[in-house]
Design a protein with these regions (language model features):
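Conserved beta-strand hairpin/beta-sheet module of binuclear metal-dependent hydrolase folds
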Residues: 2-56, 91, 151-153, 160, ...
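General small-molecule cofactor/ligand-binding pocket signal
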Residues: 12, 95, 120-125, 138-140, ...
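Active-site neighborhood of phospho(di)ester-bond hydrolases with catalytic His/Asp-centered motifs
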Residues: 41-44, 61-68, 97, 211-216, ...
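Active-site metal-binding motif and surrounding structural segment of the metallo-beta-lactamase
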Residues: 45-95, 123
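Metal-dependent catalytic neighborhoods of phosphoester/phosphodiester hydrolases
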Residues: 75-83, 107, 279-289
Length: 312
């Protein structure tokens, strides 16, 4: 795949509950299919079963942990063991804030004595980035009780639209040469003239942006990261009634999540990480967020799948 973005960007919510599982919601986990790459963001207890239920597959390339509270990472123990039992040989990289190396090594050793595949653990700080195939995942420091990160998946810019009439006017041969120009290569036209991509392509098109807040109080770093994002996934553990509890535990209310989306001018907001008290009825959270943010809002549920369309 070229560095000109991706075609597929599909999200599957594996777990949407805060702190403890419920009948309807598992602990935190999000699978992101970025063309051929499969990424996990957090891996709460039971995530591997959710991956089986919702058909994401186990061919995970990287796991990004927002922080190391138990409900966000203890599922890695069983997941690693299952990968080993399945005969995996390709490398796996685990990313997260400090103390990722210590905690993840301990977790992995609880599950297996020896791994049949290479495992790398990388600690990330605010501003760090990881390059993928057609995208970059950036780390953003947030405000939680422990060291915690939000993540920004930014698709690479895509070439501008191909001007067919202009290409024909420049005597570009139809077929493979059209594709070469769209991939950023120059070609020789039938009249012998050299045609550059800029001669037949419109303005560069921005890539899609996905922002995953993890556990956090509302903070300026997330607002900045989510500026005009295609999708902001923000935690909404509490309602207005639990504002003091949100402050104590360094979580967000649904209203605060809506306010973050509004300040960021995000194009879409999905609320997740809900307290068990809203397991059966999350309408209160949705209504409070809507009082702050006028854009599209949804409450995530386990198994929910979202595909982000390409930007024009």
């Amino acid at each position: 795949m070229s560095a000109a973005g991706m075609s597929l960007l599909r999200l599957t919510f594996l777990g949407t509950s805060a702190a403890q599982p419920t009948i309807h919601r598992n602990l935190s986990g999000l699978a992101v299919k970025a063309d051929t790459d499969l990424l996990l963001f957090d891996c709460g207890e039971g995530s591997q079963r959710q991956m089986i239920r919702f058909g994401t597959g186990f061919s995970v390339d990287s796991v990004f942990f927002t922080h190391f509270h138990a409900d966000h990472y203890l599922g890695i123990i069983g997941f690693i063991r299952t990968l080993g039992m399945g005969g995996r040989t390709q490398p796996l990289t685990l990313y997260g804030p400090h103390p990722a190396k210590r905690l993840l090594r301990q977790a992995v050793h609880l599950g297996v004595d020896a791994l049949p595949f290479p495992l790398e653990i990388v600690e990330l700080q605010h501003g760090a980035s990881v390059k993928g195939h057609g995208y970059t995942v950036g780390a953003v420091q947030v405000d939680h009780r422990v060291s915690a990160l939000a993540y920004v998946l930014q698709e690479d810019e895509r070439p501008g639209r191909f001007n067919l009439e202009r290409a024909r006017a420049l005597f570009v041969r139809e077929g493979p040469d059209f594709g070469r120009l769209q991939r950023g290569e120059s070609v020789s036209a039938s009249n012998g003239q050299l045609v550059q991509p800029a001669d037949v392509l419109g303005p560069v098109r921005p890539g899609r942006r996905l922002v995953i807040s993890g556990d956090t109080r509302p903070c300026v770093t997330v607002v900045a990261a989510a500026r005009e994002a295609d999708l902001l996934i923000h935690e909404a553990t509490f309602s207005d009634d639990e504002q003091e509890r949100a402050l104590e535990t360094r979580h967000s209310t649904a209203r605060e999540a809506g306010r973050v989306a509004k300040e960021a001018s995000a194009r879409r907001l999905i609320l997740t990480h809900l307290s068990s008290r809203y397991d059966l009825d999350s309408s209160k959270l949705l209504n409070e967020a809507r009082e702050e943010y006028a854009g599209p809002i949804e409450i995530a549920h386990d198994g929910m799948t979202v595909e982000l369309p390409l930007r024009d």
